[in-house]
C-alpha cells in the first residue's frame, strides 16, 4: 500500500538467515505476490525487487539468482582482499549473465546485523575501492566508513556527554573515503 501511495519502488530484502526457514522458491512467490497485490491496489507497473543481503558464498548467491532474485549482495569482507575480489567477480559474472545486479562489500563494520557480526571495524581504503570496483564489475559497493551494524552503535566510552542536553553523543563520522573515491572514479556508484 505504501509503494502505491507514494509511487516509489520497493526492495524486499532477504537475509541469509531467512533462507534457512523460507526457501528461495517460497521467497520468490512472496515477492510475486507483493507485485500482484500492488496491481490490485491500482499500481499499474509496480517496481518491486527481491534482494539477498549478506550472501557469503557463491552457492548462496547462485541459488538466489536461479530462484529469480533481482539482486544479490556477496559479502566477502571476512576474506583476505584478493579472495574477496575473486569471489565477488565470480558472483558478478554469473549474476550479470542472468541480468541480476550485485552489491559487493569491502571493509568490516563493527556490530551485528543478521548473522554478520564483528567486534572491530576496518575502514575501507579508497584505493581498494577503485581497484575492487574495476576488477569485480560489481554494480554497487557497501563500504566501511565508521558506521556500525545493529542497535548498539557505539560503546559509552566512544561517546561524549553533551553539556547542554546531558545526553551521550556519538563520535563524528568521517566520510573522507567517499570524497576520495568520487574524485578518482567518476560516476561510481
List the model feature ranges, each with a label:
Residues 2-18, 26-43, 55-188:
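Alpha/beta enzyme core
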Residues 23:
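Conserved, carboxylate-rich catalytic/transport cores that coordinate ions
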Amino acid at each position: 500500500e505504501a509503494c502505491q501511495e507514494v509511487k516509489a519502488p520497493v526492495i524486499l530484502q532477504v537475509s541469509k538467515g531467512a533462507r534457512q526457514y523460507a526457501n528461495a522458491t517460497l521467497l520468490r512467490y512472496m515477492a510475486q505476490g507483493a507485485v500482484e497485490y500492488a496491481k490490485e491496489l491500482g499500481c499499474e507497473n509496480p517496481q518491486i525487487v527481491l534482494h539477498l543481503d549478506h550472501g557469503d558464498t557463491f552457492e548462496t548467491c547462485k541459488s538466489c539468482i536461479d530462484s529469480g532474485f533481482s539482486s544479490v549482495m556477496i559479502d566477502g569482507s571476512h576474506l583476505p582482499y584478493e579472495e574477496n575480489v575473486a569471489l565477488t567477480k565470480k558472483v558478478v559474472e554469473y549474476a550479470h549473465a542472468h541480468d541480476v545486479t550485485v552489491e559487493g562489500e569491502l571493509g568490516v563494520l563493527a556490530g551485528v546485523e543478521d548473522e554478520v557480526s564483528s567486534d572491530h571495524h576496518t575502514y575501507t581504503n579508497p584505493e581498494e575501492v577503485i581497484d575492487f570496483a574495476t576488477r569485480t564489475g560489481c554494480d554497487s559497493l557497501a563500504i566501511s566508513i565508521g558506521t556500525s551494524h545493529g542497535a548498539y552503535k557505539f560503546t559509552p566510552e566512544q561517546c561524549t556527554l553533551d553539556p547542554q542536553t546531558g545526553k551521550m553523543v556519538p563520535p563524528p563520522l568521517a566520510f573522507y573515503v567517499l570524497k576520495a573515491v568520487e574524485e578518482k572514479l567518476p560516476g561510481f556508484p
